[in-house]
UniProtKB/Swiss-Prot annotation:
One of its GO terms (cellular component) is extracellular region. It is found in: Secreted. Expressed by the venom gland. Residues 1-15 have a biased composition (Basic and acidic residues). Residues 1-22 are annotated as: Disordered. Belongs to the CRISP family. The lineage of its organism: Eukaryota, Metazoa, Chordata, Craniata, Vertebrata. Its main location: secreted. Keywords: Disulfide bond, Secreted, Toxin. This is Cysteine-rich venom protein collettin-a. It comes from the Eukaryota. It comes from Pseudechis colletti.
Length: 22
């Protein structure tokens, strides 16, 4: 029921991946 939290988690994962690549 927390779609915002879900999206935030996805963004966090994406950011972590980008940081890893960088």
């Amino acid at each position: 029921s927390n779609k915002k939290n879900y999206q935030k988690e996805i963004v966090d994962k994406h950011n972590a991946l980008r940081r890893s690549v960088k």
